[in-house]
């Protein structure tokens, strides 16, 4: 996720500067990237965030909304398939928000978190279209504007080991007004 955010932060800085000249949203293609996770298990009712926020340079112009869309291929060794999950994002430090410190990650009650996707069901090796920032595109924008963000997931069904998410053909739609 850090690769996505670093790449998108650079592109978004340019995009925000260009979009400031018009009121239309700007579409910015992002480089392909992968995220690997040792194991994913059922966390229904809880959102798991990485211990540290993704950090990057703030854009020169504040961003109002961001939506990321593209293809995701998920590969894993199933323990219980398929993986059904929803993605979340936050800009406030989970440690200061009453989340549980689980060593390598933060565990937060999903009821108090902000979803940035609908629910997705991933079969092993399947590729599908995903959108992050729908609903709540402003939380991604707030993270870009602050220069840090935590992106996590709630797994409502399934468990797997050796999970890899390959994000391809990703595009950021940016609005600055």
What are the residue ranges of the model-derived segments?
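Cysteine-clustered segments with highest specificity for TGF-beta superfamily mature ligands
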Residues: 114-168
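Sec-dependent bacterial lipoprotein signal peptides
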Residues: 1-21
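Bacterial lipoprotein signal-peptidase II cleavage site
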Residues: 22-29
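Short, low-complexity, Pro/Ser/Thr/Gly-rich segments in the mature regions of secreted, periplasmic
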Residues: 165-177
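Post-signal peptide N-terminal segment of mature Sec-exported envelope proteins
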Residues: 29-51
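Acidic Ser/Thr/Pro-rich low-complexity disordered segments
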Residues: 93-115
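A short beta-strand element within beta-rich, extracytoplasmic domains
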Residues: 62-79, 168
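Short, surface-exposed beta-strand/strand-loop-strand elements in extracellular ectodomains
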Residues: 79-98
């Amino acid at each position: 996720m850090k690769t996505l955010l670093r790449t998108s932060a650079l592109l978004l800085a340019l995009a925000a500067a260009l979009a400031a000249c018009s009121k239309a949203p700007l579409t910015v293609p992002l480089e392909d990237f992968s995220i690997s996770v040792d194991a994913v298990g059922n966390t229904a009712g809880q959102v798991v965030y990485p211990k540290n926020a993704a950090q990057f340079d703030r854009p020169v112009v504040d961003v109002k909304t961001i939506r990321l869309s593209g293809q995701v291929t998920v590969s894993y060794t199933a323990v219980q398939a398929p993986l059904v999950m929803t993605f979340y994002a936050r800009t406030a430090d989970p440690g200061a928000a009453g989340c549980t410190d689980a060593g390598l990650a933060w565990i937060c009650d999903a009821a108090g978190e902000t979803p940035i996707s609908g629910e997705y069901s991933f079969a092993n090796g399947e590729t599908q279209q995903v959108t992050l920032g729908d609903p709540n595109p402003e939380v991604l924008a707030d993270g870009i504007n602050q220069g840090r963000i935590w992106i996590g997931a709630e797994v409502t069904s399934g468990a797997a080991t050796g999970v890899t998410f390959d994000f391809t053909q990703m595009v950021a739609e940016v609005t600055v007004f």
